[in-house]
Amino acid sequence: MTTLTRRGRRADVGQENRVDSEDYIKDKDEEESADSKDIRLTLMEEVLLLGLKDKEGYTSFWNDCISSGLRGGILIELFLRNRVVLEPSTLRKKRLTDRKVLLKSDTPTGDVLLDETLKHMKATEPAETVQSWIELLTGETWNPFKLQYQLRNVRERIAKNLVEKGILTTEKQNFLLFDMTTHPVSNTTEKQRLVKKLQESLLEKWVNDPHRMDRRTLALLVLAHSSDVLENAFSSLSDEKYDMAMTRSKELLDLDPDTEGNKPNTCEMIWAVLSAFNKS
């Protein structure tokens, strides 16, 4: 599990799964960007973009968190698009990590990774928890019969989506013994917009209440932290603003997910994913 660090590190479903629950949160502005001129990115694309080295076009070789972070992004994205919900809270299942992910709709989203995950969920009986799905989609399971749920070549597939959207380009680089496909950032404006959004959410537009934050921004903060790429968004800040952003993000991410996830009109999947990563 990743931990927030100080300035010193800156350098470097079956039928039973289908539900018609009233407990899902209606998607207000998640489907449409608040600024229509911005390129529409999924949470997974935003996380990968934050993690990519601009010129080199690849993520840090030392980052072993981003794979599971991207899978968490898939679950939140499906929730925000009203494709899945968490089963209702009961006396026996009050904790977010105990509640199963239920399929609400298997209508295709148009995103290959999301739709592939929907097919897995539709074919899975009994339903699985958020933590189980992150492990299954990452391939971290000892059960050979469940290896079929692993999503393969996720980073490369997300990168290709970003290439198609004109944000990345594709190059071949030689690393002594092998050649590697890399994806340098070609549209720096889009990445700067993404970084600015995260910075402003913790500085100029700080609301000191996660339930008043834009849901996609809150989700990105959680996923970027879990993927160990959040600090990348703060590297351009002055020392004072950097410390303030890190302090506020730590306060936010240290909140109890079960408490926050059970508050009215909350996006419980975001807190469920955070809780799953806190346990891992």
Swiss-Prot record:
One annotated Gene Ontology cellular component of this protein: Golgi cisterna
Q: Name one GO molecular function term.
A: phosphatidylinositol-4-phosphate binding
Q: Which UniProt keywords apply?
A: Golgi apparatus, Lipid-binding, Membrane
Residue spans with biased composition (Basic and acidic residues)? 10-30
Report the Pfam families cross-referenced here: GPP34
Name a biological process GO annotation: Golgi organization
InterPro entries from the UniProt entry? GPP34-like, GPP34-like_sf
Q: Does the keyword Membrane apply?
A: yes
Q: What does this protein do?
A: Phosphatidylinositol-4-phosphate-binding protein that may play a role in the process of vesicle budding at the Golgi and anterograde transport to the plasma membrane.
Q: What is this protein called?
A: Golgi phosphoprotein 3-like
The organism is Xenopus tropicalis (Western clawed frog)
